[in-house]
């Protein structure tokens, strides 16, 4: 109650302060000459009133062809990325929440797996993404529901070039890793066509020191005189990932634009052995395969003060998990043959309307129809063909929103969003979100932002229907989130630009769903947790130009994220109350440092994660927590320009200081490793459109 009263007081007082400041600053423009070094940025977009947003620039997205969006998030945001190494499952903890609390969209279509509710960011090549941003906490309600932590928004777009274009990049790295990227494009004043392909392969056999095993040292009399941690090899982590992206755009030049985006992936990955596994890697095969197609047709109609867009899409995903063991004489027997088939039909309509330069109204309605079949082919079917393991279900998901945004003057802005969702036959209550921002000082473009929202997340299909263990009586997770922060931006033309932000967030999530063991020998989900996630997010960006063509860019983020279980104990032995959630670091930070001079460039990346607990009780034993770690990567690039082509040569060192670390318990990570990339872009006749 005290927090609510404080927020209401702030919402009441801040507009009055800003209106008063507006009266005092009506003659601010003539005084601009007194601060020549400061350039105040232009009018803030109506669509972004009060948003807490992080945008990734093209340098981060197009750094090299070996990177996935998991790598981009690791080094360019304060989100914790939980992964098992390259080409392994990579999920995120956004503001202290679980992976299923982060909603992910691609060109407007939600791509979270409907079975698990989460997204594997290792399956998204960063070279396929042209624009990406994070919407923190309450800000995600503008785009999608269910993002109790936030959302990741990704899109692709046309190059807007005339003529033919080609780009090819070949990468060779440690552990016999090969990466290839090819892009073909053609454009004229109406058409833009683009084809992109990424192929990554590797046996991925890296060595590591196994701190979960000890080998004895014997003297001549076979007495133990010492012990050491053995050096082992990751023999079962090979991967082969192929991604294809086809884009076709048609612009009438009269306000209408048609688009087609088609993305196909084919992945074959081994699942690596644990550091606690004493078996022989030749005695088993642990493999995950996936084939996914995502397609979107879009139409945009734009006029001077309004815009309409309609999209229709389809997702097909086939996933297989196979586990085989040697049963003797070299004969491999299937222990598990899990198969999942997901088909999703998608449709969305959006609109924007501007009125008198002070008002903006938006609407959006989206539908996702899922058809899911999950089974283990090794399990004998019951009578009637019903499986003992898995399920066969369909569910429709509707989401609609309307918003009104008002900017009474250049200093102040208000936004109200109302959203409602339906999953299956169950409707959520209305999801309100209120945003406000205001310019506190034009000198430095200091802006205050305040927002509050309600949100819900419905159980996933696995939560409800998986056999054995699914619980159809689960309640939807619900929560309230509060954000307040300050941002600034200053610059001096052709010299430097400096911007930054500080945000306090506070979230209360009730009926958190958790899978727990049962006395029947399997796990089942229950609504058992009330979680309080709060903290601070800091961001800073600096760009500086120096004489003789030197350019420096520095970006940094920091997050302090306590995420505490405040629910009731589920048993007398429950020691999780008042403790930090597993695999959520309290502190995380990342810095990128980019220095360029003419045709040379140096990129240094650093990230830090504090210790993470592996158990809800926050046990501090060797297996109860993972130590903090720092990661350092460095890249040097040289560009060459000839009459016939542009060439680039890039060398990367990952894990520069050969840090021994774990992101997930008992999963070894590679030490120092190297990559070289050679790129070529022929200079065919082409002009910017």
Residues of each region from the PLM?
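Face-selective signature of the C-terminal outer-membrane beta-barrel domain
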Residues: 249-267, 288-428, 435, 499-504, ...
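Gram-negative outer-membrane beta-barrel transporters
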Residues: 407-412, 503-508, 527-615, 646
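Short, acidic, small-residue-rich periplasmic hinge/interaction motif at the N-terminus
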Residues: 21-62, 99
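Membrane-embedded beta-barrel scaffold of Gram-negative outer-membrane proteins
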Residues: 303-323, 441, 449, 476-534, ...
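Periplasmic-side early beta-strands and strand-to-turn transitions of outer-membrane beta-barrels
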Residues: 186-286
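Short acidic/polar hinge/loop motifs at secondary-structure boundaries
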Residues: 109-137, 468
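N-terminal periplasmic accessory domains that precede
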Residues: 37, 69-72, 90-93, 105, ...
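Extracytoplasmic beta-strand/coil segments of soluble accessory domains associated
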Residues: 70-110
């Amino acid at each position: 109650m005290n927090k609510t009263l404080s927020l209401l007081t702030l919402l009441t007082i801040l507009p009055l302060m800003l209106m008063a400041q507006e009266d005092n600053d009506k003659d601010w423009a003539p005084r601009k000459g007194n601060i020549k070094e400061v350039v105040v940025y232009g009018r803030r977009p109506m669509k972004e009133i009060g948003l807490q947003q992080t945008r990734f620039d093209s340098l981060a997205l197009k750094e090299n062809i070996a990177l996935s969006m998991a790598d981009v998030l690791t080094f360019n945001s304060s989100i914790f990325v939980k992964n098992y190494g390259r080409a392994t499952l990579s999920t995120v903890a956004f503001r202290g929440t679980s992976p299923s609390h982060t909603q992910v969209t691609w060109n407007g279509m939600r791509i979270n797996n409907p079975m698990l509710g989460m997204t594997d960011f290792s399956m998204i090549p960063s070279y396929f993404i042209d624009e990406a941003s994070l919407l923190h906490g309450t800000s995600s309600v503008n785009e999608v529901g269910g993002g109790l932590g936030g959302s990741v928004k990704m899109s692709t777009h046309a190059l807007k070039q005339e003529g033919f274009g080609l780009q090819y990049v070949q990468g060779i790295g440690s552990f016999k890793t090969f990466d290839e990227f090819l892009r073909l494009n053609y454009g004229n004043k109406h058409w833009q066509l683009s084809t992109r392909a990424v192929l990554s392969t590797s046996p991925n056999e890296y060595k590591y020191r196994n701190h979960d095993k000890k080998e004895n040292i014997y003297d001549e009399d076979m007495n133990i005189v010492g012990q050491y941690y053995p050096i082992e090899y990751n023999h079962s982590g090979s991967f082969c990932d192929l991604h294809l992206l086809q884009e076709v755009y048609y612009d009438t030049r009269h306000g209408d634009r048609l688009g087609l985006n088609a993305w196909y992936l084919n992945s074959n990955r081994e699942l690596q052995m644990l550091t606690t596994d004493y078996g022989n890697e030749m005695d088993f095969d642990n493999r995950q395969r996936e084939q996914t197609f995502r397609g979107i047709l879009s139409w945009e109609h734009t006029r001077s003060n309004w815009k309409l867009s309609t999209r229709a899409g389809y997702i097909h995903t086939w996933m297989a998990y196979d586990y085989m063991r040697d049963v003797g004489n070299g004969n491999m027997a299937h222990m598990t043959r899990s198969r999942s088939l997901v088909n999703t039909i998608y449709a969305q309509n959006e609109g924007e309307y501007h009125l008198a330069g002070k008002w903006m109204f938006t609407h959006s309605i989206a539908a996702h129809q899922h058809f899911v079949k999950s089974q283990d082919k090794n399990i004998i079917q019951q009578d009637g063909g019903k499986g003992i393991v898995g399920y066969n279900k369909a569910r429709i998901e509707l989401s609609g929103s309307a918003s009104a945004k008002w900017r009474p003057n250049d200093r102040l802005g208000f936004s109200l969003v109302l959203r409602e969702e339906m999953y299956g036959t169950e409707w959520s209550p209305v999801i309100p979100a209120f945003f406000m921002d205001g310019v506190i000082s034009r000198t430095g473009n200091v802006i205050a932002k305040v927002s509050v929202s309600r949100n819900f997340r419905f159980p996933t299909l696995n939560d409800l229907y998986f056999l054995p263990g699914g619980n159809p009586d689960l309640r939807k997770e619900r929560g309230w989130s509060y954000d307040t922060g300050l941002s600034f931006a200053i610059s001096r033309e052709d010299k430097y630009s400096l911007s930054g932000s500080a945000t306090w967030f506070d979230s209360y999530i009730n009926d958190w769903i958790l899978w727990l063991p049962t006395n029947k020998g399997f796990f089942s989900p229950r609504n058992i947790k009330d979680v309080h996630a709060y903290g601070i997010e800091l961001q800073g960006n600096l760009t500086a130009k120096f004489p003789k063509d030197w350019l420096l860019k520095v970006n940094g983020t920091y997050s302090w994220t306590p995420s505490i279980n405040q629910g009731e104990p589920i048993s007398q032995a429950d020691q999780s109350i008042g403790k930090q959630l597993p695999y959520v670091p309290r502190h995380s930070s990342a810095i990128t440092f980019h220095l360029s001079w003419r045709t040379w460039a140096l990129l240094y990346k650093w990230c830090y994660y504090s210790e993470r607990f592996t158990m809800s009780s926050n046990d501090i034993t060797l297996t109860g927590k993972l130590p903090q770690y720092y990661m350092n990567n460095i890249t040097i690039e040289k560009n060459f320009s000839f009459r016939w082509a542009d060439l680039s040569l890039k060398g990367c060192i990952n894990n520069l200081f050969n840090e021994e670390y774990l992101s997930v318990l008992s999963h070894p990570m590679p030490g120092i490793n190297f990559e070289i990339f050679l790129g070529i872009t022929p200079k065919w006749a082409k002009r910017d459109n």
